[in-house]
Amino acid sequence: MKGTTMTHLIDRRTVLAGLAGMAAAPAFAQSASGTVVLYTSNNAQSVDAVLGVAKEKQPNLKISTITGGSGQLLRRIEAEAAKPQADIFWSSSANTLGAFKQLFESYASPAASALPAALRHPENLWTASNVHLVVAMINKNQLGGKPAPKTWKDLVDPAFKGKIIIADPANSSTAFTILWGVDKLMGPDGLKALAANLTVSSAASTVLRAVGQGEFAMGLTFESNAYAYVAGGQREISLLYPAEGTFSTPEFQVLVKGAPAGANAKAAYDLMLSKEAQIALLENAFRRPSRSDIDVSKHVELPAIDSVKVFAIDEDEAAAKRDEFLKRWQSYGTATK
């Protein structure tokens, strides 16, 4: 996924409206009785998009949701392991899931055949529902007359101290992915310098609201979350894909070991990987599909993936060293909100 070296700054453009014609519905597994309990760290737009497809394509498949941060929900699943309450967890990066893999059921969904092998766990413990790019969400009205940054290095300018917000990496896989990537790209000294400018929020959703409402000049987040503000017409909001490279990470869904809903849980899992669900996610929540049979440009105006320089990170290493990294991060004493 290497691309050319270029900095992208997305301003408001015309966002395509309406759903494109969907392909004929796949033969989803037949549902039995029992409500599927979905633990999800995703935003309302993403969850509603998937539930809308479920209602249309599988009206007898009932799904209830419990929301929270990815780390919080995974620890809840761990605490419930003796008597599972969740059927599916959606979603987190592999660098976070690796520490909890004993809680997941191996399941080779028929729908996963449309995904590249790299987006499926080799033992089918998790499957990518979509792919994220890391961006800086910028509110130009809060830059104090300074030009918008173009690089990661620009973000360590002391003038931006206290003006950049990020979620807590202990509770947010988004924040962990971002900070791990910065550490690998800029080194420990670069990460420490960036940390001096950051304010940490306990909730990932606060990052978006704080920038959107002008409380902070910048927020470090995933492309899909920030682009919703561009698509919504906030002309002061733009997205930065840093020139040195940004990070790409798949977002995964898992089947919880001992899922109470049984066959229904697998039916919901299959539906979440369907072409219909991924198109709905793309058009309503701006999440790049994991399937290889969807042309992003036909649905939303996001930069082509091969036009963005992507800095590769080792997800297995990130998972193995997660606790060690978080201890080092906490030693920086970053400001909190």
Residue ranges of model-derived segments:
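A ligand-binding cleft/hinge motif common to bilobed small-molecule-binding domains
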Residues: 95-99, 217-236
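N-terminal secretory signal peptides and thylakoid transit peptides that target proteins
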Residues: 4-22
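Extracytoplasmic ligand-binding site segments that recognize negatively charged/polar headgroups
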Residues: 41-48, 68-71, 85-216
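Short, polar/charged alpha-helical segment
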Residues: 37-62, 229
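Short beta-strand->loop
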Residues: 104-113, 126-127, 153, 230-231, ...
